[in-house]
């Protein structure tokens, strides 16, 4: 899938949110953390990722276009918080108590670990598997692990191993 071009107004709204959250954090923490690099290269089902060493936030342009308001309100501060925690506390658990505190107490945003966006447009091919009670769809990665004998996946309901087909 080709990466969509983001309208400049959306990019500006993302940058505005990033700068507002960063200014708020700098004020509350009495620090002067720099503005991270922001790129729109995240692919797959992740809404975004924070790259600590390069001090960079990568956002998924497809999910952003499909969920503009919620994405800007939740994903941008979520990823910024990872960078702020790293700068403020050093390397910590990705969604640990420091991250939760930074999200809720410093930025005033609910600390959610995962997004709830529809993923049909970004999901890759899946492979049908079944157990005794239902049909399942495994990702390419999981399917390949089964084929190579590296993994056996089980149904969370009946506990039976999943079988291709």
Swiss-Prot record:
Residue ranges occupied by any SprT-like domain in the UniProt entry:
22-163
Tell me the InterPro entries matching this sequence. SprT-like_domain (IPR006640), SprT_Zn_ribbon (IPR035240), Uncharacterised_SprT (IPR023483)
Pfam families per UniProt: SprT-like, Zn_ribbon_SprT
Residues binding Zn(2+) are: 78, 82
Cell compartments where the protein resides: Cytoplasm
- Top-level lineage group: Bacteria
Could you list this entry's UniProt keywords, alphabetically sorted.
Answer: Cytoplasm, Metal-binding, Zinc
GO molecular function per UniProt: zinc ion binding
Return the protein name. Protein SprT
Query: What is the originating organism of this protein?
Result: Salmonella paratyphi A (strain AKU_12601)
Q: What's the name of its gene?
A: sprT
